[in-house]
């Protein structure tokens, strides 16, 4: 399957964190709307669809007859010569005159005015089929536009959730730093009073440095996440202020659906690719047949050479007005057929080629459908696991918090070692980190399932 679809399938869980932008409160819906309005790929797909729509009008107008007007005014000689000739490569002249016994350089003006109509009125459905190809191409490009918007919604939502998680992790590391500072201050005071060994204060200072480094790393991840979100939104930003409390609950609708909709944007796009190929195949088959045409010509012609010039070579005038004035006219109407029989032989390989293309596109459609089925099964499992972790996380945090408070109290009273307190601090920080990740993973799993089902509204209506 294409790399684009792979990104679509797994983007929900890939933590591609991004850089930061000017502080602003940003909701998920606002982020998605901004991305759809600004992102270059989405806008490009929309323009491609509009171009295909214009092509339909062009295909319909191909049925109109050709109507040509022509006018030319010339000056030259009209010496004739008996003998055959061919305008090879379009080279030759159209001077007509008597074949005299010797060359002369008598010259006059001449003119030709022409109106021509040519209409291929019956082509065994080629024109209509060309319109169908254009319409199918528009449907394909429009579905490509729709599926690009759908994938962009998924990508932006995933990046937004990652930013929420990153900001929650940053807050947890800030709390961890405050606990480490409090712990260090207590250790320094007790060590200065001789109540504990001096090494305890050194270990406490090391814990503070470790907490600061962890906080810096968390902020770096948050900045990367903000940058990633800004890129997807098509804006330049250094910081986004988001509502981290919005993922502190589980979704009200856990999406019990287990059937992928036939209106899935990605499936519709691949289905329309097959439709375009089939319409193109039908068009190629119609090239086997002849073309019936109606045509009509109206002609006016002027010349500075008189009708008696064949016997009197002085019967001409070099006057411009006399030469370009049309004094003779003709008309012609008719019906004709053209059929290039070798087209039958030439087009057969092209028809076979297009048949293989249709089969290949059908294979791709089936593969995408299988991938979406697998994604749906994966999303079901991830959603169940994420909910289990969500329910377990508060228990872990409560137990770790109680243990830290207990060890902190015991340490202040000299009843436990700094190693035990450090371990309790580490356990609490890990529990808070696990909680933040567990909360986010529930929503990421819901987003993954919504993406597999092909209905983004199932996810976004929760916000």
Residue ranges and their predicted role:
Residues 199, 413-437:
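Short terminal targeting/anchoring segments
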Residues 43-47, 60, 107, 121-149, ...:
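Sec/SRP-type N-terminal targeting helices
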Residues 7, 151-265, 275, 428:
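Periplasmic alpha-helical coiled-coil/stalk elements that build and connect Gram-negative outer-membrane
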Residues 1-40, 458-463:
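Bacterial Sec-dependent N-terminal signal peptides
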Residues 191-195, 411-415, 452:
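A short glycine-centered flexible hinge/capping loop motif at secondary-structure junctions
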């Amino acid at each position: 399957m294409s790399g684009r679809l792979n990104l679509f399938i797994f983007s929900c869980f890939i933590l591609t964190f991004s850089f930061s932008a000017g502080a602003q409160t940003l909701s998920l819906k606002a982020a998605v709307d901004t991305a759809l309005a600004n992102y270059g790929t989405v806008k490009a797909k929309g323009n491609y669809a509009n171009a295909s729509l214009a092509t339909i009008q062009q295909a319909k107008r191909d049925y109109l007859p050709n109507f040509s007007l022509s006018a030319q005014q010339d000056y030259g000689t009209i010496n004739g010569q008996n003998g055959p000739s061919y305008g090879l490569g379009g080279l030759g002249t159209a001077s007509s005159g008597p074949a005299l016994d010797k060359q002369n350089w008598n010259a006059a003006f001449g003119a030709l005015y022409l109106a021509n109509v040519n209409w291929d009125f019956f082509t065994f459905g080629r024109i209509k089929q060309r319109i169908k190809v254009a319409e199918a191409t528009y449907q394909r490009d429009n579905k490509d536009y729709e599926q690009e918007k759908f994938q962009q919604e998924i990508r932006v939502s995933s990046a937004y959730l990652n930013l929420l998680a990153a900001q929650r992790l940053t807050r947890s590391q800030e709390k961890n730093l405050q606990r480490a500072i409090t712990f260090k201050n207590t250790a320094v005071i007790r060590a200065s009073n001789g109540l504990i060994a001096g090494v305890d204060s050194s270990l406490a200072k090391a814990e503070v440095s470790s907490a600061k480094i962890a906080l810096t790393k968390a902020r770096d991840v948050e900045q990367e996440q903000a940058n990633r979100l800004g890129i997807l939104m098509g804006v330049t930003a250094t910081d986004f202020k988001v509502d981290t409390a919005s993922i502190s609950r589980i979704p009200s609708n856990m999406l019990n659906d287990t059937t992928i909709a036939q209106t899935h944007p990605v499936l519709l796009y691949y289905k329309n690719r097959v439709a375009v190929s089939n319409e193109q195949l039908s068009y190629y088959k119609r090239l086997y047949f002849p073309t019936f045409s109606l045509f009509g010509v109206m002609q006016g012609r002027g010349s500075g050479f008189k009708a008696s010039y064949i016997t009197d070579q002085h019967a001409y005038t070099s006057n411009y007005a006399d030469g370009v004035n049309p004094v003779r006219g003709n008309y012609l109407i008719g019906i004709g057929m053209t059929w290039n029989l070798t087209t039958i032989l030439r087009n057969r390989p092209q028809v076979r080629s297009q048949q293989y293309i249709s089969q290949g596109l059908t294979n791709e459609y089936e593969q995408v459908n299988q991938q979406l089925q697998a994604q749906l099964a994966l999303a079901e499992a991830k959603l169940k696991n994420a909910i289990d972790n969500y329910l377990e996380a508060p228990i872990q945090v409560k137990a770790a918090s109680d243990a830290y408070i207990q060890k902190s109290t015991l340490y202040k009273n000299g009843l436990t070692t700094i190693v035990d307190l450090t371990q309790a601090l580490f356990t609490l920080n890990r529990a808070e980190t696990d909680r933040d990740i567990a909360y986010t993973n529930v929503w990421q799993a819901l987003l993954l399932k919504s993406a597999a089902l092909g209905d983004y509204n199932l996810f976004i209506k929760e916000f």
